[in-house]
Amino acid sequence: MATSQQYGSAGQVGGPSAPQPAPQQPIASGSGVSAGGLPAPANGSTSTPVSILSTSVTLTARQLAVFKPAKVFSEAVKRGKDITSLAYDAKGDYLLTAAEDDVFNLYSCKKGKLTKTFYSKKYGIDLARFTHKPDCILHASTRGDNSIRFHSLQENKYLSYFRGHESRVTSLQMSPVDDTFMSAAANESVRLWDLKSSKAFGKLRMQGHGVVAYDSSGQVIAIALNERAAIVLYDIKQFEKAPFLTIRIDDSAALSQISYPPRYPTITYIEFAPGAGNTILVGTAGGVHYLIDAFTGALRRRLVGGQGGRIGLEPEGLAAVDAYAASEKEAEEEKGNEGEGDKTEEGTEEEKKATPRSMFVPGAGISGSECCFTPDGAFIVSGSATGQIFMWQVPTDFREVDNGRNLDPVAVLHGHQGPSRCVAFNPRTAMLASAGRKLAFWLPDLDEDV
């Protein structure tokens, strides 16, 4: 799946076959080390989830069903604010968070501890991403000139700036193969950049809430066109030409049962499946996500909450967030404590200038990181307004007769406090992170029968 010629031919995959799953290996227990290297309890108790996952080991639905919060960082973000993005480095050693309080934190996945805190009070921070240098990151600004900033974690300074976007950046992705990256801004443009130059080398005008993604080869890019409920695929070497495939998401039959004319939820996230990348995950702010065939454009599955509840962060999502914030405030007031921590925080003048991404496009939701594939591509994980974590198993054999069928979750996890705005699965270990008003590290509980 490295070239555009391998896409868009109905009935033909054209790319390399998907890698065969590696033989299932037992998850180690009693080793004194938990998933991601988190220390096991000193007393030898197995009440804390313990596991080690090799990159060659495939996950199972039974393992995912027993994931539980192993550690919760209740003060990972200022009260009344949310974490808006999560990112692991390529080795899975560190987790980077960005939040509405203009703080980005670096956590050690091996130690399960906060390693370092950084501030971007002047520019704000969103969509923090590791580059191929583990000590350098990219992030979008939430105010000012809408620039993208290249930051050294080791030196704690900005190395360069990428200016040109005329509105707030809504999507930012690093190429998986080199030092180029891609960004999208609301109602403005998609741009291609290189870390070695401050000027974009590619630009495409667009409307609506921009969302972008690379395939695993870095040669094909996907752009969501919300105003057309479509995904367009480009050969990155021919970005200035027309897309080689336009995928129109036709979900009118199901959506018309909710409202007529059917109202399509805003696309907030897209991701090619790891490996062969023959499917595309289309995350939305509404009550459904989609699995799309990357070669034919067919709608394979509708990911819904089933009996587990409603997924998505909009339109009910904001109400749930507000309700959770109100409950937190009420709990603080009931404590009757005096001091700075109990006062309503109005924020600085600079903080007040920050505009949520959702304000640019109605229905865009409150995150762009609410769903993702697991590293083996076998499962999809999603947060929700209620805090529940939904997990779906990706079918291994898609049949045309089942196209557009609802896919119910194989597991629904409970334990995240407040809306789970962001989820991210560690690329190397059996560790899941979820975030919103709090940050949680999840590990499989091997006391359960897996």
Model-found features: residue ranges?
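Blade-level signature of beta-propeller repeat domains, shared across WD40, Kelch, NHL, RCC1
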Residues: 421-450
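Hydrophobic beta-strand positions that form the internal "hydrophobic ladder"
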Residues: 95, 137-139, 181, 221, ...
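WD40-repeat beta-propellers
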Residues: 104-109, 148-152, 172, 190-194, ...
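Conserved strand-to-loop turn within each blade of WD40 beta-propeller repeats
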Residues: 98-101, 140-144, 184-187, 224-227, ...
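Blade/loop signatures of beta-propeller domains
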Residues: 14-68
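Inter-blade linker and blade-boundary elements of WD-repeat/beta-propeller domains
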Residues: 53-78, 113-120, 157-164, 168, ...
